[in-house]
Amino acid sequence: MSKKRLYEIAKELGKESKEVVARAKELGLDVKSHSSSVEEAVAAKIAASFKPAAAPKVEAKPAAPKVSAEKKAEKSEPAKPAVAKEEAKPAAPKASAEKKAEKSEPVKPAVAKEEAKPAEPVTPKTEKVAAKPQSRNFKAEREARAKEQAERRKQNKGNNRDQQQNGNRQKNDGRNGGKQGQSNRDNRRFNDQAKKQQGQQKRRNERRQQEDKRSNQAAPRIDFKARAAALKAEQNAEYARSSEERFKQYQAAKEALAQANKRKEPEEIFEEAAKLAEQAQQVQAVVEVVPEKKEPAVDTRRKKQARPDKNRDDYDHEEDGPRKQQKNRSSQNQVRNQKNSNWNNNKKNKKGNNKNNRNQTPKPVTERKFHELPTEFEYTDGMTVAEIAKRIKREPAEIVKKLFMMGVMATQNQSLDGETIELLMVDYGIEAKQKVEVDNADIERFFVEDGYLNEDELVERPPVVTIMGHVDHGKTTLLDTLRNSRVATGEAGGITQHIGAYQIVENGKKITFLDTPGHAAFTSMRARGASVTDITILVVAADDGVMPQTIEAINHSKAANVPIIVAINKIDKPGANPERVIGELAEHGVMSTAWGGDSEFVEISAKFNQNIEELLETVLLVAEIQELKADPTVRAIGTVIEARLDKGKGAVATLLVQQGTLNVQDPIVVGNTFGRVRAMTNDLGRRVKVAGPSTPVSITGLNEAPMAGDHFAVYEDEKSARAAGEERAKRALMKQRQATQRVSLENLFDTLKAGELKSVNVIIKADVQGSVEALSASLQKIDVEGVKVTIVHSAVGAINESDVTLAEASNAFIVGFNVRPTPQARQQAEADDVEIRLHSIIYKVIEEMEEAMKGMLDPEFEEKVIGEAVIRETFKVSKVGTIGGFMVINGKVARDSKVRVIRDGVVIYDGELASLKHYKDDVKEVTNGREGGLMIDGYNDIKMDDVIEAYVMEEIKR
């Protein structure tokens, strides 16, 4: 017994599968979905349950063409009243009742309606309605035409599909027939596929028939005009009700205001009236406001399908799954065609769309402000056109144009020289001034500038005194006596820390002493260009007299142009002879004031503290004569006395303030270092915050330890101090990398020619005093072209470290006569690049000095022809050049001589020889009457009978 599936039963009955499934469940059948299968008897039972609502298929078939004929007749007739269609329908007592019946009754097949139409009589009410003329329903006509076209396309498509299936079947039959050895299994597979395709085709046809039935069912008509009229009437009624309520509220407010005015006192009436008036205004504003129109209810019903012949769920039951949604372009076009559509606004508002911008008024152009030209312009070399334009407030293009008219091609980023800038300013009528560049890293300018110190603020400052002399002559004892006397005067603490300098007070005035090894430290500072000493105390022992180091100290003081006070020490000894010391010093240029000189002499005994007060008074007297002044109001400048590295404090420097006032936290540049004064201590080891002129202090806070003799200066801020310190360190490094060329006898002429020297500085050391005097007198007599020999220092004894230091400071060389330098001096001379000349014959020293001084004059050379030769044959050698075979006819041809090539009495070439040979041997010269071969450097055009003239350049001796 065969079975049927529920969806097949639904197709036969023309019902939806879910209705059949629901009816089967009502009948008590155990079914799960439309794919469930039932027996034929059960299927007949389910079909019988639908019989009262379903029309028989046999009666529907002959009625279908009749309906189409009637529709065609309706289309062909001219616009009839719409009631004519209703005559064919079953009569109803009223039109509204008819609409309700259509809504309430379930949708029946169209065939049943078609059969019922001719059977129903026309009632008199319908005739009454037909008398009213109605407009033609164009929408219904369009739908009818669309249905007919869909039916025709469907029939054509079905025919084409049948033909295609027949062709495919024949093709498959032919293919299978060609295979003789095909098995039964393949035949069964083919048959199954064919059956499957037939079943799919059958289901498609059934779906199409079902769609046709649904489309033929008449949809209930909706009168949109009546709906709109009813909605509008409802809105008007709502507006009238709201207006009436607001009007009543307004009247009630007015009545309440009137009653309140009658009840209340005059003072209260005014306040209450204001409140009620405000309420009345609010109510009036509400009355005047137009009520918002209610938007019509949105029709949420499903829109009618664009293609009635195509079901949305057509492909849901296929094997490939549901079909993807296609983009509906018709809806996009509908949006574009709407009146208030905004789809193209972005395109219209694009920047380059000229159609939009045609009617727009152009924005007014902002006028440039006119700037007057400045009267003065301060410029620097290398300024660009853009910088000049910004300074004078003009466009760079304008300046470029002016430069072009002046014949200068320039761009706005091109640098201009000072002359061009001045010409440009003349064209504009502006006075141009060149800006004076100030080197911020140059500390020396503070020491030489006249405008740095304020003349009105100058005050007297303490003198700075350096004690010099031979070590055994009592220098150390004198320093100790001065210190002990200071402690004895009651200054508590004494000198607890050695910082290189200290101060004492005499008669209410301060004196600063530098506690340094006299001449050595003095010369080191002199070599660095530092001169901090105001007065020199030269200590000479009365029993020993003038010693070599005493003479050196005298020369150092004279080189620094510092006044000398002679302290004749050890006068308490039995063998003391001060008069002899005065005479010996007079021989070396130190004359006493009693003898008509300018040096003060004081006889003291440092051991027994004798005449120490007189020595200090003499120092103050000399300082008063010098009129030592300083300005304490400016930023501090001075010199480094000594420096060291401390484990706990870092770099510690002892400074001597020469001008201005040094404060704690001042940004400072010391030599090639920089920093900020973090802490400051005086010579007693006490912390101070301020240090005036001629005050020695020890400071911390530097990034590195400076060199003794370096200058220091206080800057405005730490930023400028850092920049100056870094720039000075950079310059020092570059200077160190460059080879420093010292003066020697060979390059003396070049140095003098460059204008670096105006005299020759010499230090003379000899074995005996007579040799020193003779050599000094002989050298000073040499006078060539105004060049003078300056004897910086002359003494008896070996060449020591002090001599090398003095030579390095004075840029001099040392002449040693019958003496030798010590190992330490030789090592220092090599390190400082100081030249030492050693001689044993005096006239050779004089000749060497004369030759060095004559070298200052421009050398004169004279040409001297040494020989002539004639070219007899030429040989051209590849990769070598032309070789000329020659014979010397006069004199000789030397390898180091220059040659001229003379042809027909005309000099063709002048140059040097590349090679000279006699046969195959290289020779230095070829003499008269001999033959040889030569090559000229850089010249190969040698020909026969050319004359080769050999010559040399000889310097004319003076």
From Swiss-Prot:
Residues 605-607 are annotated as: G5. It holds the Pfam family EF-G_D2. It is found in: Cytoplasm. GTP binds at residues 469-476, 515-519, 569-572. Residues 469-476 are annotated as: G1. Residues 50-224, 288-374 are annotated as: Disordered. Residues 460-627 form the tr-type G domain. GO terms for molecular function: GTP binding; GTPase activity; translation initiation factor activity. Residues 50-67, 157-169, 337-346 have a biased composition (Low complexity). Residues 515-518 are annotated as: G3. CDD domains: IF2_eIF5B, IF2_mtIF2_II, mtIF2_IVc. Its main location: cytoplasm. GO terms for cellular component: cytosol. Residues 68-89, 96-118, 138-153, 185-195, 290-323, 365-374 have a biased composition (Basic and acidic residues). Residues 569-572 are annotated as: G4. Keywords: Cytoplasm, GTP-binding, Initiation factor, Nucleotide-binding, Protein biosynthesis. Residues 494-498 are annotated as: G2. NCBIfam families: IF-2 (TIGR00487), small_GTP (TIGR00231). One of the essential components for the initiation of protein synthesis. Protects formylmethionyl-tRNA from spontaneous hydrolysis and promotes its binding to the 30S ribosomal subunits. Also involved in the hydrolysis of GTP during the formation of the 70S ribosomal complex. Belongs to the TRAFAC class translation factor GTPase superfamily. Classic translation factor GTPase family. IF-2 subfamily. PANTHER family: TR-TYPE G DOMAIN-CONTAINING PROTEIN (PTHR43381:SF5), TRANSLATION INITIATION FACTOR IF-2-RELATED (PTHR43381). This is Translation initiation factor IF-2. It comes from Streptococcus pneumoniae serotype 4 (strain ATCC BAA-334 / TIGR4). The gene is infB.
